[in-house]
Amino acid sequence: MRMYKMMGLGLAILLSLSVTGCGVKQVAMSGEGESYAVVDATGQKVKIPGKPKRILGNSASIDTMLLGVVTADHLVGATEADRDPAISYIAEDTKDIPMTIPLSGLSMELVTQARPDLVVASTYTKGEELTMYRNLGIPVVVIDGPRSIQQVKDDVRIIAAAVGEKERGENVIREMDRQLKEVDDTLGARTDKKPVVYLV
């Protein structure tokens, strides 16, 4: 039970980090430079021509992780969930992104309209959707649908590598670790206290 609570806390911390950006507001990505390769969560080696300027995440959780390492002006689409302040920590960050991705998902028309130079998807993404991106010649990086704190960290590292910001990804993970330890220490101190019973 505690593991699931800590995983939820880790995701919440990641959400808060995407808002503060860990200093990400100063990022300037050119989209130029040498190509590089990234190995995604499926073991696929993905060649990326240079730092992407037009990035498309296909879920709210992916957009949240992306905003931990890049600024919102690098995202070419935002999901309906991203924009809902009742459930999203990134509603304010994504309000000016022109394209809204409906809950029904991305169509070929929307993808061609967005013209992304990188798509970030997850292992929950349908195979035909991944095939659509690849048939359009777009590099696709797949992350795990996280089921643990470690997978959240692995996903952040893959995304950071894909956008050419590895060090920024490590900064996010270090801050996650710091906050998780702080909370774990606090919880541990509370559970270590033995109840005292007075008999009269």
Descriptions of predicted regions:
Residues 2, 6, 21-64, 167-198:
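Bacterial Sec-exported substrate-binding components of ABC uptake systems
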Residues 33, 41-43, 50-53, 70, ...:
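Extracytoplasmic
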Residues 57-114, 118-123:
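A short, structured surface patch at a secondary-structure boundary
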Residues 36-47, 52, 76, 118-121, ...:
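Extracytoplasmic/periplasmic mature domains of Sec-exported, cell-envelope-associated bacterial proteins
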Residues 41-43, 60-61, 80-83, 124-125, ...:
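Solvent-exposed coil/turn segments that connect beta secondary-structure elements
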Residues 128-200:
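Extracytoplasmic substrate-binding proteins
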Residues 10-18:
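Bacterial N-terminal signal peptides
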Residues 54, 58, 67, 103-106, ...:
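Extracytoplasmic/periplasmic, Sec-exported soluble proteins
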